[in-house]
Amino acid sequence: MRKVFISSISMQKVNAFKYDSGVYPENNPTAFPITISLENNCQPGDEVAFITIVTHSEGNLAVENYHKFCEQAGSICREKGARAEFIELAVSARIEAASPRRLYKEIVAKLQDNDEIYADITYGFKYNPIVIFAALNNAYQVRENVDIKEICYGNLYNGSAEIKPEYFDVTSLFYLNSLSGLMGVEGMMGDGGNVLL
């Protein structure tokens, strides 16, 4: 079993903040909210895979931020006695109609049976959270023994200019969506279990 951490890297300058979290009250300052999940869920001997979406273009800081992320996540894994694998999904800053579908296929191809998955939807293009949710749904429905443990995001602003870092767990939305899908299928079933068209 692998513990898989999926996230996107910011294209802008990032700063470390201590995030207020009802899920993990004790956490270290970070610029990458997914590391909060890592710190609190990584155990000695774990096999950890980081699937990270990195936007490549001239003038943005994503590649530099990715190197900082790898250093921080790698350090946490070493401290915990876990083995880390870093998988970079390089994407172009130029968005095309096929970009979301291409990213979806790349994420799905990297997921395996028995994965325990944590995802962070803080950074990235507007379509990234939808793509990540869709890829997780595919893994949950198609792969064997996949567990979607957590979907989180870090928020810095709460309706004012004052920075107020908060860490939110939105995993329940994933499972509500899965249940809605099942209820939709149930509504289409006839007496014999056949789908009504």
Please identify what each model-predicted range represents.
Residues K126-Q141:
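Short Gly/Thr/Asp-enriched flexible loops that form oxyanion-binding sites at enzyme active sites
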